């Protein structure tokens, strides 16, 4: 599939309604937002990268315009959706950029069908949920400030019912041990050239997890951001990060 342009559409993929956009020309690149985010998070990036890649930008299941599901979100199921979306679009292999939960989805894609992910950039992703993340996840929905609710309402058009369904998934994450459970031997099956980006002050995932993941993934590089938290490139550092990520992805 080359040279496709799309304003966005909703289609049934893998048995669920998925919203996605396809824009630009070049090698297929899947952009995956984080948990509770949406495809809107990539709006500025799609304008800048449209002449470098064919951008495939979905709302993951349960997110944005992909509607509400009656069961908790699982990264593994979202990865199956994304592989099915590639099939639906006639895309054999792709590159990927995922932030937080989007990076977790890419890990599943790159281990389920290693030959289909040629290169990927993982920002604040994790092979498993450590204890400190589980503690935060348990209480996250109970302490969400009103300002964050307004951000979520902007991202999720189904309103508070959709947001509450998403937030219920954070408690499910806290007790799940089979969704994110990548051992080093399993990570070693990844064929993609991989850039791992991690803040050294991430409250969810200690930097040591990323160091171990980089050792396990054979063709990986690790970019540790000093004093960086979760999603350390978001904010003032985003334009420079996009340049670095684009250069890495175009080389692979």
Where are these regions (language model features)?
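Conserved HGGG/HGGXW glycine-rich cap/lid loop of the alpha/beta-hydrolase fold
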Residues: 16-67
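Active-site loop/oxyanion-hole signature of alpha/beta-hydrolase fold enzymes
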Residues: 23, 47, 56-97
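Flexible "cap/lid" loop of the alpha/beta hydrolase fold
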Residues: 104-112, 118-150
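Active-site nucleophile elbow and catalytic-triad environment of alpha/beta-hydrolase enzymes
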Residues: 169-186
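Short beta-strand/loop motif that positions the catalytic acidic residue
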Residues: 190, 196-198
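Short alpha-helix in the alpha/beta-hydrolase fold that links the catalytic acid
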Residues: 192, 206-215
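Acidic catalytic loop of the alpha/beta-hydrolase fold
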Residues: 201-205, 231
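Catalytic active-site module of serine/aspartate enzymes centered on a nucleophile-bearing elbow/loop
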Residues: 220-221, 226-252
């Amino acid at each position: 599939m080359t040279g496709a342009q799309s304003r966005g559409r909703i289609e049934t993929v893998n048995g669920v309604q998925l919203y996605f956009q396809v824009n630009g020309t070049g090698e297929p690149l899947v952009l995956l937002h984080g948990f509770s985010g949406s495809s809107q998070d990539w709006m500025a990036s799609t304008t800048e990268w449209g002449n470098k890649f064919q951008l495939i930008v979905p709302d993951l299941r349960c997110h944005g315009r992909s509607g509400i599901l009656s069961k908790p979100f699982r990264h593994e199921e979202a990865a199956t959706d994304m592989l099915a979306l590639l099939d639906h679009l006639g895309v054999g292999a792709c590159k990927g950029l995922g932030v937080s939960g989007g990076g977790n989805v890419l890990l599943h894609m790159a281990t389920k069908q290693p030959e289909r992910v040629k290169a990927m950039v993982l920002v604040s992703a994790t092979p498993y949920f450590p204890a400190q993340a589980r503690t935060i996840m348990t209480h996250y929905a109970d302490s969400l400030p009103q300002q964050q609710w307004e951000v979520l309402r902007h991202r999720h058009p189904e309103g508070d019912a959709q947001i509450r369904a998403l937030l219920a998934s954070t408690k499910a994450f806290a007790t799940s041990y089979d969704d994110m459970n990548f051992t080093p031997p399993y990570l070693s099956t990844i064929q993609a050239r991989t850039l791992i980006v991690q803040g050294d002050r991430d409250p969810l995932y200690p930097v040591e997890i990323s160091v171990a993941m980089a050792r396990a993934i054979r063709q990986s590089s690790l970019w540790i951001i000093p004093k960086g938290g979760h999603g350390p490139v978001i904010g003032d550092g985003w334009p420079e990060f996009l340049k670095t990520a684009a250069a890495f992805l175009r080389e692979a």
